[in-house]
Design a protein with these regions (language model features):
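Short histidine/acidic/glycine/proline-rich micro-motifs that form metal-
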Residues: 10-13, 88-91, 133-137, 167-170
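A generic structural signal for alpha->beta connector loops
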Residues: 32-34, 60, 123, 155-158
Length: 193
C-alpha cells in the first residue's frame, strides 16, 4: 500500500508532530508499505480561489492554480491512504493544511460544476496525526469532527485521529507511552485498510 503524508508544522525537524509521524512512518514502512511525505511549510500552496476551473474536467484535478499542490494531487491520486500530520493551533490544523484541504476537496470532488461528477478521492482512506496542548478530547476534538465531515463529503473512509498531548516546552514530549501508542495507531491503520 502507498500513503501520501502531508506534514505541516512550522517547527519542522523540532516538531513534536514529526516525532510521532516518524514512529507512524517507521511502523508503516516496516510492514512493507510505501509513503511519500510532503512538508507543507517548505512548499508553496495558495488558498482556493473558488473559481471552479477544476469542475470542468471530471477525470483530473484541473486546478487553475499551479503550485506545489500539483505534486500533492498526483501523489494522493496514486495513494491508498492520506495522512494529515499537523499540530493543533487554535483548535484546528495549521493554515497550510487547511489551504491544502480546501484545494483537495474542490479539485478532486467534482460536485460543484454545471454537471455533478465523481469524487476522485472515493475509496481512499484518511487518518490524522496531531499534537496539542490540551487533553486530546478538548484539544483535537474539533479537528477530528472536521475531518469526519470532510471525509464523508469527499467519500473517503476516515480511519481516525491520533492525538498526543504536549505538556509544555519545559517537559520532554516523547514518552514510551506516546511512542507505543503511535506505533499501535499505525498498526491499527494498516490492518483497517
Amino acid at each position: 500500500m502507498r500513503a501520501c503524508v502531508l506534514f505541516v508544522s512550522p517547527r519542522r525537524e523540532a516538531s513534536n508532530t514529526l516525532a510521532v509521524t516518524n514512529i507512524f512512518l517507521n511502523t508503516w514502512r516496516a510492514a512493507g508499505h510505501r509513503a511519500e511525505v510532503f512538508s507543507l511549510y517548505d512548499l508553496s500552496i495558495a488558498p482556493c480561489r473558488a473559481c471552479r476551473a477544476c469542475q470542468t474536467d471530471h477525470a483530473a484535478p484541473n486546478c487553475a492554480i499551479h503550485d506545489d499542490m500539483d505534486d500533492i494531487f498526483e501523489s494522493i491520486l496514486q495513494s491508498d491512504l492520506i495522512v494529515f500530520a499537523s499540530p493543533i493551533y487554535s483548535w484546528y490544523c495549521t493554515a497550510p493544511l487547511k489551504a491544502a484541504m480546501d484545494r483537495l476537496v474542490y479539485a478532486l470532488c467534482k460536485f460543484y460544476g454545471e454537471m455533478r461528477g465523481p469524487s476522485l478521492l472515493e475509496g481512499k482512506a484518511l487518518c490524522a496525526i496531531t499534537t496539542c496542548g490540551y487533553r486530546p478530547e478538548q484539544g483535537a476534538d474539533l479537528f477530528d469532527e472536521g475531518l469526519r465531515r470532510w471525509c464523508k463529503h469527499a467519500r473517503v473512509r476516515y480511519l481516525g485521529l491520533f492525538a498526543a498531548r504536549h505538556m509544555g516546552y519545559d517537559v520532554p514530549f516523547m514518552t514510551p507511552e506516546i511512542a507505543e501508542n503511535a506505533k499501535a495507531f499505525a498498526e491499527k491503520i494498516f490492518k483497517n485498510m
